[in-house]
Amino acid sequence: MTSYVWEVLAFAQSLNKVGDDVPTVQNPEYFRDAFLAVQELVNKGLIMAGHDISAGGLITTLLEMCFSNMEGGMEISLNKIKEDDIIKILFAENPGIVIQVKNKHKEEVKKILEDAGIGYVKLGKPTEERHILVEKGDATYQFGIDYLRDVWYSTSYLLDRKQSMNGCAKKNVSRTTRNNLWNLYSTNHSPANFHNSALTPTVVLRQVSKRLLSVKKEPMANAKWPICSIWQDLM
């Protein structure tokens, strides 16, 4: 397993602790096998949700998986991860992926990953409480999802204020922090229902092409904000 890289984390940069050791893929064949295994899981309909581990590390991945709804959270155990440093585990930006699967599919998922030689760790489960609880050894850490979503989006808001007029940035941040993002478009037109809808990807692209559309995406921003803005405009 690749060791966790500390010096170039976004978290480390915020503390002015910047080094020259960067996360990298040391075994491209393993990376390829992992990608193909995940594609097999997707094609077989075994993945409910997924998110890459990249900028911001594991904790950012888990939070972003919760940002797009208004209910529920996660209970996470890091005890099966052999690294003791909680900061490295939560904030390291080594390439990885987090997936959610149904209990009835977990044995099939495990077999596919093991047959492909892909290492994995069961992290936790969804909960009704609106926070992420992270356990490591005797310590438990609580992360408030809605509060951290506002913090996460604040940088985009500050940039929007300089690039938009007439209070549009304030209206936008008010809408996205109060409302369930998935309610920005009709359930019948969700991506999951493309195959049953007249609104196919081709139609969407054709409609978008008729508009003067400008999508701004800051570094480390999640793409769901501009995507949801597009959906809202089309409905």
Walk through the language-model features, giving the residues of each.
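Intein/HINT protein-splicing elements and their conserved insertion hotspots or analogous self-processing inserts
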Residues: 1-91, 105-210, 218
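Mature N-terminal segment immediately following signal peptide/propeptide cleavage
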Residues: 210-213, 220-222, 229
